[in-house]
Amino acid sequence: MKRISESGLEEILILTGESPKESDVKYIGEACKIAKKYFRVIGLEVYPMNSSDYAYLYECGADFVTVFQETYDPDRYSQLHLGGNKRIFPYRFYTQERAIKGGMRGVGLGALLGLNDFRKDAFATGLHGYLLQRKYPKTEMAFSCPRLRPATGKSSDYNCINERELLQVICAYRIFMPYAGITISSRERSGFRDNVIKIAATKISAGVDVGIGGHTGKEHKGDEQFEIDDGRTVKEIYKAIKDAGLQPVMSDYIYV
């Protein structure tokens, strides 16, 4: 984390898989405590938890929780998740609300566009965020816009959406919820990301390395979870934002 912070980043996202056995709450909490030494904002993208767990992680320094419903169609969801805790649709659906009750100042939502009819899932995602905002007006809402992309060991192009359709979704989110955050990941190509920050996006990742140990110089090749299309460094992303006539902001959260 020290190495990442030296790049100039002030926010970090801590990720785990879906197994509490491999990454229990205490382990994630220790990671948050370490991250708090180097970063202003700590986001979590981990398996769904109970409110008490989120309260503990908040005390450890976490600020923000993102969970992807993947698809909002219960029938399609059950086809894709045959076992394990992840198969429980309602528990995953109410994750953001439990995180808010646990003290988190913000939550993120997203469907994996392409698993089902992307327009229906995008509509459901927007409605989910809108209803949460109505119920918890002081909580920051944000949308992520992942779509099916190549993954290690897998090859599938069914229901994949193109950039034009993805931009349609992003613009719909912006019109529907003008003050929500919109995040665009490094899995999208640089040209697309450079354009979308001028239109609707509020946050983009930079200097991403998805391999284990990638920032330490001891990366285990072949362990990457997925491929990225925009491999630019933090300095390169910073310059691209300025060249677009925009102001790069490493963190917009002020502690008082």
Task: Say what each PLM segment does.
Residues F123, R134-V256:
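Auxiliary Fe-S-binding modules of radical SAM enzymes
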